[in-house]
C-alpha cells in the first residue's frame, strides 16, 4: 500500500518530461533500490555517517513533523562493481530510532531493504523526485562523490517515506553520474 507524501518545495510528483526514459524509470522504480542495483553488478554499501540532528524543514515536511525536531540520520554510499553509484540518506524521529525504527541503528553495512520489505505493517508513500541543489539536506554529501572539475553535474534524487506504527522513516536516494553509464550498459548474465 502506498500513501501520499507531502510535497516539500522542489520535490515533484512525476519526472519532468525532459528527462530520458532511463532516468524516469530509476527515479520511480518500485520496490527495493538495492535489488535493482544488484541486477547491474556486485553492490557494496558503505556507511558515511550516522548522527542525531534537528530535522531540516525540507525533510520535516516529508515526515509530517515540526522543523528542527530531533531525528536520527544515516547516510550511505552504494557502489556497483567498485563504481560509486548512489548516495542515500535516511532519517526518522530520534524517539522512533529507539522504538519502532531501532533496526536502522543496527544495520551496519546492510541496506535498509533488509528491514523494510519483510514486515506487512510497513507502508510506503509514493515517490517524489527532484534535481538536487544547494540547500537540499544531502546535496553536499552527493556532490562530494561526483566527479571533480567542470560544471556541477545534474544530480537527480528520489525519496519516499515508510510508515510503521504511525512513525515515519524518510529515505532519499541520489543517483551519481557514473550510475547512468552502468544502468545503460548491457547486463552480463550472472
From Swiss-Prot:
Protein's GO biological process: pyruvate biosynthetic process; ubiquinone biosynthetic process
InterPro entries associated with the record: Chorismate--pyruvate_lyase, Chorismate_lyase_/UTRA_dom_sf
UniProt-listed Enzyme Commission number(s): 4.1.3.40
Catalytic activity: chorismate = 4-hydroxybenzoate + pyruvate
Pathway: Cofactor biosynthesis; ubiquinone biosynthesis
Top-level taxon of the source organism: Bacteria
A GO term, aspect molecular function: chorismate lyase activity
Binding residues for substrate: 74, 112, 173
Primary location group: cytoplasm
Enzyme class: lyase
Keyword Chloroplast in annotation: no
Keywords recorded for this protein, A-Z: Cytoplasm, Lyase, Pyruvate, Ubiquinone biosynthesis
GO CC terms: cytosol
Localization annotation: Cytoplasm
Role, per record: Removes the pyruvyl group from chorismate, with concomitant aromatization of the ring, to provide 4-hydroxybenzoate (4HB) for the ubiquinone pathway.
Family: Belongs to the UbiC family.
Name of the protein in question: Probable chorismate pyruvate-lyase
Organism per entry: Bordetella pertussis (strain Tohama I / ATCC BAA-589 / NCTC 13251)
Gene expressing this chain: ubiC
Amino acid at each position: 500500500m502506498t500513501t501520499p507524501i507531502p510535497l516539500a518545495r522542489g520535490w515533484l510528483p512525476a519526472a519532468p518530461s525532459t528527462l530520458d526514459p532511463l532516468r524516469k524509470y530509476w527515479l520511480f522504480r518500485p520496490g527495493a533500490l538495492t535489488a535493482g542495483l544488484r541486477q547491474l553488478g556486485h553492490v557494496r554499501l558503505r556507511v558515511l555517517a550516522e548522527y542525531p540532528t534537528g530535522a531540516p524543514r525540507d525533510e520535516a515536511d516529508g515526515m509530517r513533523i515540526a522543523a528542527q525536531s530531533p531525528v536520527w540520520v544515516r547516510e550511505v554510499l552504494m557502489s556497483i562493481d567498485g563504481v560509486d553509484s548512489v548516495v542515500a540518506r535516511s532519517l526518522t524521529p530520534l524517539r522512533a530510532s529507539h522504538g519502532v525504527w531501532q533496526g536502522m541503528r543496527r544495520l551496519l553495512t546492510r541496506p535498509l531493504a533488509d528491514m523494510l520489505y519483510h514486515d506487512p505493517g510497513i507502508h510506503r508513500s509514493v515517490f517524489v523526485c527532484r534535481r538536487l541543489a544547494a540547500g537540499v539536506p544531502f546535496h553536499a554529501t552527493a556532490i562530494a562523490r561526483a566527479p571533480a572539475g567542470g560544471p556541477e553535474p545534474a544530480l537527480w534524487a528520489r525519496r519516499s517515506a515508510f510508515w510503521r506504527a504511525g512513525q515515519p522513516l524518510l529515505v532519499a536516494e541520489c543517483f551519481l553520474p557514473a550510475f547512468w553509464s552502468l544502468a545503460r550498459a548491457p547486463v552480463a548474465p550472472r
